[in-house]
Amino acid sequence: MVAERYTVDLNKPLVFQVGHLGEEYQEWIHQPIVCVEGPRFFESDFWEFLTRTVWWAIPTIWLPVVCYVLSISASKGLTFPQIGLIVAFGVLTWTLLEYTLHRFLFHIQTKSYWANTAHYLLHGCHHKHPQDGLRLVFPPTATAILLVPLWKLLHLLATPATAPAILGGILFGYVMYDITHYYLHHGQPKEPTFKHLKKYHLNHHFRIQDKGYGITSSLWDKVFGTLPGIKAAAKKS
């Protein structure tokens, strides 16, 4: 007897439904629903609230933190040129983190109930509803939690003076990433660089999901061989 395929009811909260899709989950999330109005995730208004973040909350919350940690490095004797170089290193580090997380965590293949559920919350929802403007940037609460182990790791690997500046660079890179990501989905860029980035990223969403993992840059896609080719894109379209 063939098991009946599970059907997600889009009129009900989605999070605890998607796990039932099993092996069909990956196919389902890559059939996007393009609308500005996002779906409901939870029955609870409290948990629903925590999943929604306006884009401008990211620079408002995190840029002051960037300035604060850079001031720590300055107070410990680093010059502004030294801080600038370390921040540049931190930003470069972020671009590699951006690529690595997107490729190996956000696009991990899942099929069990809880793995599908967790993946949907992490990234699957963005591929299913790519224009949901309130679930495009990373929630500040989750970012704050992740910053704790990162801060401790940097203190182990770097000096007391350089660790804050590295964190500032990584955090600044993250802010630029989230703002850029939002703009690529909801902006209408005229400048050639951003027009290219928008086309590059939407190609990842709608044509070749296993290529083009960079958001702010295609650098690491070039380095690691995941740059989508023109011929491949044509075949998928």
Curated annotation (Swiss-Prot):
Signal peptide limits: none
UniProt-annotated location(s): Endoplasmic reticulum membrane
TM region positions: 54-74, 77-97, 134-154, 156-176
Location (main, coarse): endoplasmic reticulum
Oxidoreductase keyword on record: yes
An annotated GO BP: fatty acid biosynthetic process
Keyword Endoplasmic reticulum: yes
InterPro entries membership: Fatty_acid_hydroxylase, Scs7
UniProt cofactor note: Binds 2 Zn(2+) ions per subunit that likely form a catalytic dimetal center.
Keyword list, A-Z: Endoplasmic reticulum, Fatty acid biosynthesis, Fatty acid metabolism, Lipid biosynthesis, Lipid metabolism, Membrane, Metal-binding, Oxidoreductase, Transmembrane, Transmembrane helix, Zinc
GO cellular component, one term: endoplasmic reticulum membrane
Binding-site positions, Zn(2+) 2: H126, H181, H185, H201, H205
Tissue expr: Expressed in leaves, roots, flowers and seeds.
Mutant phenotype after disruption: No visible phenotype under normal growth conditions.
Function of the protein: Fatty acid 2-hydroxylase involved in the alpha-hydroxylation of the long-chain fatty acid (LCFA) palmitic acid. Probably involved in the resistance response to oxidative stress.
Family: Belongs to the sterol desaturase family.
UniProt subunit comment: Interacts with CYTB5-A, CYTB5-B, CYTB5-C and CYTB5-D.
Protein name from the UniProt record: Dihydroceramide fatty acyl 2-hydroxylase FAH2
